[in-house]
Amino acid sequence: VNILDYIGVIIVIIIIAVLLVMVIVVELDKKKLRVLAYQDEVTGLFNRNGLEHFWSRYKGKGELAVLYLDLDHFKTINDTFGHHVGDALLRNVSTELSRITNQNQLAFRIGGDEFIFIMKNCEPHKVEILAGLILGLISKPYYVEDHELFVTGSIGITMTQSSTVEKTKLLAEADAAMYAAKRLGKNCYSVYRRNRQQFIEKVKMNMGKNI
């Protein structure tokens, strides 16, 4: 075997190594793009695409609770101080929400000041505890560009144990319950009772008050 044969083998090995690196880079880029597609660029939480991805994988497996959170008076803050301050406030609130996320508790920002919390494998009393915890976490002063900002939240809750309940129906129920919480004075949560077609089962103020 002469030296040219060795050189040829080395060249082939180098080409294979380069191709493998290129494949790995492409796959990493694809994975990064998938992550970015599911991530809200303002808050870093999952976005609407992430929520759709969750629903596509869930397919009615196990008990599920949907908590629809809307920040109280956020529009006033946004209009008064500007969108950049509003975005900073959303990031701060999202940081608080991320403290209680895990594989069974997922947080999504679906637009504006609206968030969805999904709780898997849930029990009703634990869902209400989570709602109170969320209200307690976000209800505090936030300091953005020398402004002291204070927000509270209104939460609508719906739960299902059935694989036949569609996501659109669940979101509509949680949304309706959230608006019921708004009508009750905000800074509280309400639970949708599907069997009676009623919005309110129980309302409690945040953990710092009545829980």
Roles of regions detected by a PLM:
Residues 94-98, 126-147, 173-175:
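Alpha-helical scaffold within the catalytic cores of cyclic-nucleotide enzymes
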Residues 65-70, 107:
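Active-site-flanking beta-strand signature of metal-NTP-handling nucleotidyl enzymes
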Residues 38, 94-125, 142:
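Conserved helix-loop-beta segment at the catalytic/binding core of cyclic-nucleotide signaling proteins
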